[in-house]
């Protein structure tokens, strides 16, 4: 069975998404490109769009696209406490009919499993915790969190961002070897040095190391396109990478 291919709307860039009329306006293009689903980004909404989540959910259903919902927030705040807005974000995810809600780990200190379990059990959406580009998402804290969450039988999984290990200065293959059993969603991304940091690039511009890393992760995990989708013909570009990842 081929893995589900998801297009992350942010791959088109915030400016292009706005020019095209917002994330809802991208759905026909993404469907025509052959994708199975869309990752909706909260940071790309304006205030009015945040009030129209049910309408977005209906549009996703009409286009027969699965939904994932990404929020630019951390599960754990800087003081180590659970993000009090998590129930709100899960509710927003439910309104668009999302299968999963993606957040970053944040500053994990100690697992308050009962509090987190109460929040998760109140929702039909699966929480998937991602390694972002900050020191809080280095391999050691990610492992510690998922080991404890697994021991506590918490109903959550990991979003494995293939490119973000470069920002944290770690080896993606080593991370995959230790974290793959927790992974249920993959952000496909590769990056190259750019000044004192990195920048994401399209797969056609990268070497083949991304294939080895992808093959080290669960074969049935949905694959999200989070590298830049750019060009004069966005439909052709999107279709090219949907086909590439489906065959990889």
Show where each model-derived region lies.
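Active-site acidic/histidine proton-transfer and metal-coordination neighborhood
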Residues: 59-67, 75-158, 167
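Short, electropositive alpha-helical surface patch
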Residues: 56-67, 119-126, 219-220, 235-248
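Histidine-acidic metal/acid-base catalytic patches
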Residues: 1-11, 15-34, 87, 97, ...
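N-terminal pre-domain/capping segments
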Residues: 1-87, 94
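Alpha-helix termini
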Residues: 47, 77, 110, 174-176
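Short secondary-structure transition/capping segments
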Residues: 50-53, 80-82, 113-116, 140-142, ...
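Hydrophobic residues within beta-strands of alpha/beta enzymes
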Residues: 38-39, 101-103, 127, 186, ...
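Active-site beta-loop-alpha junctions enriched in small/polar residues
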Residues: 9-14, 41-45, 70-76, 106-108, ...
